[in-house]
From Swiss-Prot:
<keyword id="KW-0963">Cytoplasm</keyword>
<feature type="compositionally biased region" description="Acidic residues">
    <location>
        <begin position="569"/>
        <end position="586"/>
    </location>
</feature>
<dbReference type="GO" id="GO:0030154">
    <property type="term" value="P:cell differentiation"/>
</dbReference>
<dbReference type="GO" id="GO:0009826">
    <property type="term" value="P:unidimensional cell growth"/>
</dbReference>
<dbReference type="GO" id="GO:0009734">
    <property type="term" value="P:auxin-activated signaling pathway"/>
</dbReference>
<dbReference type="InterPro" id="IPR046357">
    <property type="entry name" value="PPIase_dom_sf"/>
</dbReference>
<dbReference type="Pfam" id="PF13174">
    <property type="entry name" value="TPR_6"/>
</dbReference>
<keyword id="KW-0539">Nucleus</keyword>
<keyword id="KW-1133">Transmembrane helix</keyword>
<comment type="function">
    <text>PPIases accelerate the folding of proteins. It catalyzes the cis-trans isomerization of proline imidic peptide bonds in oligopeptides. Essential protein regulating cell division, adhesion and elongation throughout the plant development and embryogenesis. Required for the spatial organization of apical meristems. Involved in the hormonal control of cell division and differentiation mediated by cytokinins and auxin. Regulates the function of NAC089 transcription factor by controlling its targeting to the nucleus upon plant cell division.</text>
</comment>
<keyword id="KW-0472">Membrane</keyword>
<keyword id="KW-0677">Repeat</keyword>
<dbReference type="GO" id="GO:0009793">
    <property type="term" value="P:embryo development ending in seed dormancy"/>
</dbReference>
<dbReference type="InterPro" id="IPR019734">
    <property type="entry name" value="TPR_rpt"/>
</dbReference>
<dbReference type="GO" id="GO:0003755">
    <property type="term" value="F:peptidyl-prolyl cis-trans isomerase activity"/>
</dbReference>
<dbReference type="GO" id="GO:0005634">
    <property type="term" value="C:nucleus"/>
</dbReference>
<feature type="domain" description="PPIase FKBP-type 2">
    <location>
        <begin position="175"/>
        <end position="260"/>
    </location>
</feature>
Amino acid sequence: MAVGDQTEQNYLPKKKKSETEDDKRRKKIVPGSLLKAVVRPGGGDSSPVDGDQVIYHCTVRTLDGVVVESTRSESGGRGVPIRDVLGNSKMILGLLEGIPTMHKGEIAMFKMKPEMHYAEIDCPVSAPENFPKDDELHFEIELLDFSKAKIASDDLGVIKKILNEGEGWESPREPYEVKARISAKSGDGHVIFSHTEEPYFFTFGKSEVPKGLEIGIGTMARKEKAVIYVRKQYLTESPLLHIDQDLEEVHFEVELVHFIQVRDMLGDGRLIKRRIRDGRGEFPMDCPLQDSRLSVHYKGMLLNEEKTVFYDSKIDNNDQPLEFSSGEGLVPEGFEMCTRLMLPGEIALVTCPPDYAYDKFPRPPGVSEGAHVQWEIELLGFETPRDWTGLNFQSIMDEADKIRSTGNRLFKEGKFELAKAKYEKVLREFNHVNPQDEDEGKIFGDTRNMLHLNVAACLLKMGEWRKSIETCNKVLEAKPGHVKGLYRRGMAYIAGGEYDDARNDFNMMIKVDKSSEADATAALLKLKQKEQEAESKARKQFKGLFDKRPGEITEVGSEIREESKTIEEVDETKDNDDDETLEEEGATTVSTERKRKWSEKAWPFLKNVMLQIGIQLGVVLIGILIFQFVSAKFT
């Protein structure tokens, strides 16, 4: 940035901070309604600000010195100081304005008019019973401590004060295994228990410690030390820590010694990744989240009593690691999902159900169908995809072509979701590519159109014909005469029973490019066949609907409903795209489409039937009108 730009930026108007409710309340303060006298000076130069937790004793007296209420035990209170978070807690106006003027350890006397305490209009704090809220009063405040607060619960029932910062960004969560040293004191400072030598071990999410403590620990980093303030509503019973349920609040001092990452990958407890040895780097920034080339050692075991080992790369592969590219379906889905969340050098134990293990993947010897397995995986390292930043146009297109070719291979293997992901990855990268001349622009545009149509082909194979149409539209909106776009969209229209739209697209192909007439004619023949099949299906399914007497119409309706229950089981067509190829690949795929939704299949039949119903109703209405006319004529 140039110096002139920097100077100009310094003089740009700053965004005005929005006014808070507390700011609005402060504007109502009348001079002389709040007076302060320092009884004992505090230490240091700093004072609390919004976002700080303040801990203080408060004694309220009349101007004659009679104690109205107090937190101090010697003045009739419980001995438990008040904890508030400036800017978050509901406070009387006098303290909201007065406490930020104090230093730690200071004792001050605030003389308040009624409107500065509980007589304030719309005061957010209710006055205690029998409190003289219409009187001028003295509030003696001792500011015991203040510090930055981490609010762990919206109702301020759990607040954390950091004593020593931890390491890294990761915090424990369900179902992580936690190792922590924990001590506890009541709100008045009495020690409940001290466990500073041997740490506690517990699992997140199993209610082994009070709820508030678990919430607070969930905000901590490894080796962090903190005080977690927990109010009564979060002091739930737990088997590991016994807390008196009569206590109003407890202060837990916690040192998070270690935690073991345990991840429920599916959220239902079936696919679990448990870290055995930490890796190098920060989670998740240094994990192979993107498609990468990975190198791993692994041991596969059956989930039986013997933990039978069916494969060990160190033994069965002569200590040579397995190397594979993620995002290509080269390993079981559960295996790949977990390795994407590993750090280099990490060892993890993965427990996997059969549908994410070998039921949908070639089974190794010794693994039966429906077998649950465990893998012990060590991520040795990985190579990330080449960064396109700084590459020239030709290099970028070469990289794009490599990824597209991989997608085409996956498509031919019937791995449509994986293929789609490859095409979409290139399309995302293309958002940052700027061709420099007309030739580059044409190459870039043609490639992008090709990728969109490949995505559309994947969606069609996956049964998502509507999304396939929407994707084709991205090409046709910019280039209405794109022949392959018209063909692909026409096929998607056929899949959805939108036969008129399909016919329009195929006819448009012939109009814009005579060389496509053979393909368009073949598509029109296929369309005609589909229409005939749909018509025949409709006649068969609704046979007898108009032959029934009026009293029998309900019975016919029930027949229709019975037929509709089984419509999803009817394979009305073969693969719509037997002759269809991906751009420049020239190879047909060997895979059947997923079953479409009932509504998508049934619509052409229902449309035909509704037309017939309309005709029949019209005939009936005309008959009624003629009858009424004749009757009127002869009466």
